[in-house]
Swiss-Prot record:
Name listed for the protein in its UniProt record: Urocanate hydratase
Entry function: Catalyzes the conversion of urocanate to 4-imidazolone-5-propionate.
Origin superkingdom: Bacteria
Any GO CC annotation of this UniProt entry: cytoplasm
Subcellular location, record wording: Cytoplasm
This enzyme's EC code(s): 4.2.1.49
PROSITE patterns the UniProt entry points to: UROCANASE
Originating organism: Brucella anthropi (strain ATCC 49188 / DSM 6882 / CCUG 24695 / JCM 21032 / LMG 3331 / NBRC 15819 / NCTC 12168 / Alc 37) (Ochrobactrum anthropi)
Gene name per UniProt: hutU
Amino acid sequence: MSNPRHNEREVRSPRGDELNAKSWLTEAPLRMLMNNLDPDVAERPHELVVYGGIGRAARTWDDFDKIVATLKTLNEDETLLVQSGKPVGVFRTHKDAPRVLIANSNLVPHWATWDHFNELDKKGLAMYGQMTAGSWIYIGAQGIVQGTYETFVEAGRQHYDGNLKGKWILTGGLGGMGGAQPLAAVMAGACCLAVECDETRADFRLRTRYVDEKTHSLDEALAKIDEWTKAGEAKSIALIGNAAEIYPELVKRGVRPDIVTDQTSAHDPVHGYLPIGWTVAEWRAKQESDPKGVAKAARASMKVQVQAMLDFWNAGIPTVDYGNNIRQMALEEGLENAFDFPGFVPAYIRPLFCRGVGPFRWAALSGDPEDIAKTDAKVKELLPDNKHLHNWLDMAKERIEFQGLPARICWVGLGDRHRLGLAFNEMVRNGELKAPIVIGRDHLDSGSVASPNRETEAMKDGSDAVSDWPLLNALLNTASGATWVSLHHGGGVGMGFSQHSGMVICCDGTEDADQRIGRVLWNDPATGVMRHADAGYDIALDWAKQQGLRLPAILGN
């Protein structure tokens, strides 16, 4: 019997200004869905896998075809409903309603486990959407580069007087998310040693210039790091190996990185983490024949790696969990002090979230890189005093290879996002850009996620697990007129550990779009300021007052 999730076809998004659908509001999700499966973008496009273990864009290839066909015929007053990658209904709504509403991987809490999800997945009843895979706004590794860069820069400020020259970062994983780490480290001025078990992933990062060199030898990797740090160079190297074996070996040798983290796909014990002593081929085969055995071996290996990370932490080396839930896995394996070292959000990112600052991203539906160059210039024009952001845009232009449709990410917050969106829409209207722009974000944002082991770890008021906030965010984005809105479960940290929402809005140059953009790109980050103000963060309370937010039970207005 053929596998409904495997097809050798090659999918690429259309380019240019010719419509395949009835309007740009349906053309936009069509192109971004297809862009998610572009072989230059997705990790395993023939299996519909975009990134993050088994994060898919559609449940089956038949579902993909039906989504495409439906988007091509969808009217301006209709909304498509997508349930875990399957197009289940089209309903009449109105012109300002979202054209697509997506719910992926959501399970009733008591049943929200990998075992139960995998049973449903095997029966074809569910799909893991990760964050931006099933919500059709993944832009390749660039999507996480700036967030990782901001994290490393802040770590440098806190631990090394703001200077990472001559320092090096140890990490693991070069997949769709982890692949950003070597480039982000270099941009921040540091060297990076990234351990990756799957050589094809390392080769992909080499081709796209996200990593500088590759080796199979730990000794060679360490020699290179020593050479570069002594010379004050910022370069990166991928070491083909297993992080669960390499990290303890480094501890044993007394090697001292300057920062330690990890971004393997530990959130998914079956599909995301290679057990100690296994080959990649053996691992792939047993994912199908013995998934529970794989998970058991992977969890035991994660415990070994986390113990090594604790050893680094106890030796005084800054060590953080980069949001893959590896500490939780180790804790469940009996490592009682697994959470002694912090997650990256409470350690470095939360002050940004308090101002609604997060991963604002956009893609040029024209396919023309010049459209991104023009929008980069517009960002600089509208935010003239944000020199840190200007520096990021300059580095991104020089170092980041576009994957699929040209795109850009830059971290901006409440008060700036709507200004940029309206400016982009005006550029489409007056012909400066060759086709419309879509604006979206990662689900990792200030008001759109509840994830007690990542984005909402160690909240000031103890509200880490309260998931009303992403639900309210999705509802408000729907009411505000986003072009498509998504509500997912389990992204980043795995089943049972997160709920999160996403939105995308199309700048098609119309005056109607001005109204939608103004609402969505104000309200979306405002929910993040609201959420953090409610938790008692002074930065968020001050920013809410400064921006004139009406928060009755929080500000008394």
